Amino acid sequence: MASPTSDDSQPAPVRQPAVSNDDMTPSSPTTFRLPPALRYALAVFLVMSMAVSARQAAYYFSHGPMVSDLRIFMTGLDMMRSGEGRQLYRFDAQEAAQCRLYPETPQAGLLPFNHLAYELLLYWPVARLPYRTALIVWAVFNLGLTFLIAWLMKPYTGNLRRVTGIPVALYLLGFYPVVYVFGEGQDSLIFLLLVVLSLRALDHGRTFLAGFILALACFKFHLALAIAFLVFLLPRRWRALAGFAVGGGLVVAISLAIVGPNLAADYPTMLRQQETMTPWGFIPWFMPNLRGLLQWGLSRRLDIGEIVPIILMLSAVIGSAAAYLIWRCWPGQDARRLYSLAILTTVLVSYHLHMQDLTMAVLPMLVLLDLAAGGEFSLAWVTLLLAAVAGLYGYRLTAEPFPVLLVRGCLLAVPLLLLWLVSYKGYGRRPPVNE
């Protein structure tokens, strides 16, 4: 007999929401549909948001390597190709390599590569390309990822698509952080893809694979570990944890092969020193999380020594509340609710988060909107959800008349907190039992 905490020990009375064989859409879809005027208005809003974000991305394409993050990865690639992999996590070596590639670096400031080295293999196809060509090729690749993610999200957006008539890809492209990734040459859409693939694997009962896939996202290990803690450890999914451990071991082994034994000492040292060595990469009020919001909001009244305990305390409250709910409600919740709450909790309590990392908020937004379209929430909660989504989607358009918002990404923590409350409420609801 299986132990009470094994992956296969889900009690019979509580089951996952029924899904049909037709693309896994809910078996009881909503019949409501927005009036044509509202559907067109929503589509126009998303297209406008996409256009404004694309104009900003075009700026990055036309102004060279000093305004985008691709130089971070190109620097790491250059060091690998030139046999300097053993020095990858040394500031002086990276600065020399980046200055060699981009002579303007001393004026703009070093942006060092600080992820596990295995990630550079993803960028290897653009290693020999001129910078602008590499940025364009990487943007096209990210555009393809966007459509792939939209396709993978179809099982979780059936009600939303029926109500609005808008394809999932437009929701993604209308979200500023997604298009921001195109111009920055960043890796956040790869991270989101791996999270969505992990969700799909867990939904299909492939728990080991779900953990293994999520471990491949450990190039942002602080985010991947937090999500794994919430979606695998607390719900006692031991096979998923085993998969995560195997995947984590693989990416560390590849990184060791690139960097050598220096990885064990140099990498933690770089992470400890980076905020001091390159402070321009760690401006808190750029960060759409609790740390950014509180440091920006309290900096005029309190010094940093007084602000940090407040950040830690509020982060602990939110993290503990989510952890307790997940622990208490196990088993019986479907994976989409679990991943949504885990992602939003991770975003809010993370110590280091940039605008491009907010791409992963697309998953909980679309899932919660789909649940609302299916009648899961009361009018009050739907209103709160729509206010949160409007704040997140309207940020970039609002920044047109108020450009200071572009350097106040921390304000996005407010709608994210509202979204977290809705997700918390949605997770606390038991899914319907099918007779």
What spans do the regions from the language model cover?
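Membrane-embedded alpha-helical segments of transport systems
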Residues: F219-H222, L250-I254, A380-T383
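Primarily membrane-embedded glycan-assembly and transfer machineries that use lipid-linked glycans
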Residues: A2-P4, P13, V19-L209, F232-V362, ...
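Aromatic-enriched
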Residues: L369-E435
